[in-house]
Structure formats: structure tokens, C-alpha cells
Amino acid sequence: FGERVKKYLLHKKDYDIVIDNQSLSPGMLEIQKTYPFIEIIHHPITKDFKYDLIYSNGFMQRFFKKRWYSFLKMNKKVAPKLKKIITPSANSKKDIALDFKIDPRRIDVIPNGLDLTIFKKNNGLESERFKIVTVASADIPLKGLDTTLKAISLILDKYPNTKLSVVGNPRENGHTERVIRQLNLTNHISFKTNLSKEEVAYEYQSSSLAIISSLYEGFGFPAAEAMACGTPIISSNSSALPEIIQDFGQLYEPGNSVALRDCIENFYLNRSFYNDLAKKGSLYANETFNWEKIALDYEEQFLEIIEKFNTC
């Protein structure tokens, strides 16, 4: 990809700035010599690799995971030579600097933005009292769905009306489906797939609680989206999630299904407290993840990079 872009830009001189979204390929090093250039890194993929290895079964699966992530060697060579990097959280900045051996002074933090005309509180919609929503954008261990499923199985003895709506698509006959059968959760779990943004927002708005169970997030779109929709949040105390959620949700130890069960029960017993937090969180999300504000931050970065490039 980087080589194709490099060749293309050799013959096109009408761009003010080039922005690369985490290809981290050698061609980018050539491009930054001839154009004002910014690299966007959401988070270091070394973290995905780490958790994939932890949850791999057997030698062959680990072998193929290592083979798949072989591009990380290229990433680690290219990243330290990039002049300007933007990432969406202070936690990602720390991890990028550490894993890719980059001077943190070359990394700036600008959060991701939301479409707040879609992800917003719907005052005309009453949430379902025992409906919980979670998002698993990929059926991988990194998203921590196992923890949520086990916590739901533990809470059902006291709260049998609990239902979990999962925004995501499990692999057919894969790990997640096996766990659901083993825990006898089939009648308590529904998967929502191929949703529009409006439909995703509805899942937040119609739920009484959102659970974010990821083991690692460079930002955490589901957390920000749920906050913007005014949905109470319980989240793992992992990576960038405390930074995104601030004091507007309940945190628990990543991977601890018993702790998550206790948090869910605490929510059921103290709904008004959590709903008050959610109202404050919605205001915070609207101020912090507002694209108009974020666009101005990016514009400031673009102008600075262009000016530096033109004066060198």
C-alpha cells in the first residue's frame, strides 16, 4: 500500500498535506520528505498480538498468529522515524511511545469524535428495565465478551429477567457460541448485526445499562457512544477506558466476571445514582467528543505541520 501511494504522489503535486491511518509502511517515510505529513495511530497493534497469543490454543494456533502479525516488524522500524503522530488517548500515546520506542514529544493526543446528532439521549424512549447492551465489534478475546457472558450467567439467579443485547456477530460454531451454550444463556442473549449508526444508538438508548468489557482499547467508541446516549456504564478498568469514561461510570477489574456481576447488582439496587452519573456523562461526552471542536484541533495541527514543512 505504501509503495503504491508513494508512486501516486510522485505524479500528483496538488495536496496540501498527507494523512496516513496506521499503515506504518516504509513508503510513508519517503512521503514525509516531500509532503507535510501526519501519521494517525489508534493504538499499537502489539497489544492485539499480546492478547491473541495469551488466548491461543496450542502450538499451531500460536504459530499462525505470529505469522499473521509479522507486519509488526515493519511497524516497529517505521514508527520511530515518523515526525508527527496523532493518537486518540493519553494511554495510547504512552503505549505507542513504549512499544514502538518513539519520543513521546512527537505524539499529540486528539480524541475521536462522534456524530452527536445520532448518538444522543432520546427523551421520548423509555429504556427496558433489565436490558443490558454490550458491543463486540469483533469476535476476539480482546473485546472481553466472555467476562460479560459469565457475569450475566451469575446474575440470573437473583435477576432472571436480565437480557443481554450484543452489538456484533459471533463466528458460527465459534468460541462465543460454545460459551453461550455451556452457560445455558441462549434465551438471555440476542445478537444485533449489520446495524446502521441509528440502530446502534437505539440499542444504547433502549438499554438500562451498557457494559464495556474490553481487555484493551486505544480509545473505546462504545464507551463514548453510550455516554453520549445517556446510558449508565460499567466498564473494565483497562487501558484508555478510565480516561474516556472519567468519573461517569463504574469500573471493575478486567476479566473478573464476579466483580462485574457485583457491579451489575449494584446498578440494579442503585439505579438513580447511576442514572445521575449518566446524565453528567452525557454532557461531558457532548463537550469532549464533539466533531466541531475536534476538527479545530486537527486544523491547528495541519497548519502547524504545513508551516514547519514550508520553512524547512
Each model region followed by its residue ranges:
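Short alpha-helical donor nucleotide-sugar binding micro-motif in glycosyltransferases
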Residues: 194, 202-207
